[in-house]
Amino acid sequence: MNVLILGAGLMQIPAILSAKELGYRVCLVDADDKAIAISKADEFRKIDLKDKEGILQYAKSLQNGSGLAAVFTAGTDFSASVSYVCQKLNLPSHTFDAALNASIKTRMRKCFSDANVPSPQFFNLDKDNFTQDKLKEISSLIGFPLVVKPVDNMGARGCRMVRSLKEFEPAVKIAIEVSRSGNAIVEEYMDGPEYSIDALVYNGTFTVTGFALRHIKYPPYFIETGHTMPAELDKSVHNQLISVFALGAKALGLEKGAAKADIKFTKNGPMIGEIAGRLSGGYMSGWTYPYSSDLNLTKEALLIACGKEPEELIKNRQKVDFETSALCKNALQPYQLFEVKSKKVSAERAWMSIPGIVEEVKNITEEKIPYVKDFLPRTTVKLNCKVDFPRNNVQKCGNVISLAEDRKLAVEAAQNAVSNVFIGLKANTRETDDFLNFYTQDDEDNFPPSAFKSLSSQELAQIEGFIPQNQKISDFIPSVLKTSDYKKEVDWSFNTISDIAAKFDILRPHHPKLNAQKFWKAVLRGGLQAAVYISDSEK
């Protein structure tokens, strides 16, 4: 008996392993015939995940052959393709209509609005109604900042904050370009901490299977630098967030399968960013939640997709009280609410790069870091490839996952592992020089950001002279960078100024004579990568 999984990338590996554990033969489809998970499958077909009819024909051949137990995906945009095939073949899943509601953001927002589920005000734009007058009208109605997204994409691709009319038009153009349907959605900005929540919907029950705090940084983009599982929350806030997620899932029509929410807790209570009809990507459903809870969420989701009872889910879940906020105080409970709670803490953190061309990728020290479970570099980050400071979550360079009984230990382990990664860049390249010289696009004010706050011209003038050839940089940290303001400040790699100096001394014990002001200015702009780049460019 076969299980058909859409996608053959890293995010689908937990599903492949879980299906095999359940005794099924695993068949994969993906447009990329070099995808990394293909070798783990029993059969692979090169089919674009957008091609519903092509997937359906392949699924029919499996069903008519040795049998097809389920069609499944996790961490892709294509839950609607899953539901389309399942509905045609009478297999368990969300309905195709519900899956479309959970895939197309304008449909999603309308469902929320019709059901009075708290979510931002929105407008739809495409190339036909995209005019300056329309942009002015929208901005006058919801004000700045606002958010622009493609209606049908994930990974924050084409998604950004818009802070002025100058930024509005370029943002909409990009969102329309990366949208599969050529549509963008404009929303009011929601201010508040953001959470990712996974759940399984089954027989009128809604069981939360992962509740994480997302660490979103670097406006105008929404870059997830990591997440921590579980989130630490007041019980009432916790229950309100779950209750509003459940109301949103019900409004979309999700009844049989997985659901995943990105949701904020604003000054007015929970508001939904979006809900997908699938398990989350971003290492949550397949890594941090199973680690922290001891529950194989993917396996339980697959059991539902196979029409079987998710026994471990039912055995370990606890009741959650339905609790509404002022924005939906008259709402009726949509499902019976449960949660399988995390027992430990798992932290995921990402590492990133400043712009340039990769010359080396290495760990600064070979010392094993306690509590680190996974070290996951992106396959796209290799010698001679271009890297950039991320504008979406696909452009990050890698991820680390830790697990510990204690929150502080888990977080510190992940951060220490990230700080131990070094991506060296080719010397004297335009992209890196432009970054160090603060060149930015007109519609990206102050982006990419700096690693540390800049010195004033008077403070910079205090840094004089040269750092002698082959001398330890740690012995030449300027006094202006030893103040309390800089001692505890860390960059995106979780390094302080003194950390950077010590790591430079490990990476480049032999270096040329360096202009001190130029060197430390580069450190403030781009951290350790910039320090090594400046040194290498002087040779």
Language-model-derived ranges and their functions:
Residues A37-I38, P150-D152, Y221-F222, G281, ...:
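Short, flexible turn/loop "capping" segments at secondary-structure junctions
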Residues Q240-A261, K267, A276-E359:
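Active-site "cap" helix and flanking loop/linker of ATP-utilizing ligase/carboxylase catalytic domains
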Residues C159-P270, A276-G281, Y291-S292:
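Internal nucleotide-binding/catalytic subdomain
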Residues A156-G158, V345-A347, K396-V400:
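Short amphipathic alpha-helical segments
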Residues A350-L383:
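Glycine-rich active-site loop/lid that clamps phosphate-bearing ligands
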Residues K127, R163-S164, A199, W351-P355, ...:
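Short beta-strand-to-loop capping motifs
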Residues I104-I185, D191, N203, A231-S243, ...:
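Active-site nucleotide/adenylate-binding loops and adjacent lid/helix of ATP-dependent enzymes
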Residues M1-A98, D128-F130, E309, N316-Q336, ...:
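ATP-binding N-terminal substructure of ATP-dependent carboxylate-amine bond-forming enzymes
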